[in-house]
C-alpha cells in the first residue's frame, strides 16, 4: 500500500509510478490549445473575440460558403484532436507495458469539440448580428465592446477608436431594432 490511511501526502504522490514523457507534454499542450480555441468560438467564453464565420480564412462570398469553410475547419480540428488523443494513449500504453490490455484508438464520437451544425451556427450568427446592432460587438475590433445597459454610442465609438462615418457597421443609437413593418415607436 502506498499509504494505509485516508490521507495522501506529498511523499505518497511522489511514490506513484509515472514516467515523464516529454512527447506527452507537447501533445497535451496542442490538445489544450485546440480545445481552448474551440471554446473561445462561443459567445459564452470570456475570451470570445469574434464569430468564426466572419474570420479571415473562413469568410466566403456568401454565408453558405463561410459555413462550408467553417465546417471544414471544425472537422479538421476534430480529426487533429482525435490524432493527438490516440497518440497520447499510445505513448502511455507503451510506457506502462499495456499493449495487450488497452487500445490506443479514440473513436471520433468521444472527441468533445463542438461539431459543425448549420442550425446552431446560423443561430450564433444571428446572435452575433444582434450583438453588433446593439453595440455589444463590433466588426471594427474583436471582443466585447459594450456590456452595460446604460452604455452609449459615444462610448462605443471611443472604444473602437473610429467615427460613426468610418464604421463598416454602426450600432443602433437607441437599441430599438424594428422587425415589423408597422410603427410602434416614434423613430
Go through the PLM ranges and name each one.
Residues 1-15, 26-34:
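Basic, amphipathic alpha-helical recognition segments used for DNA target recognition
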Residues 18-187:
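Non-catalytic DNA-recognition/assembly elements of restriction-modification systems
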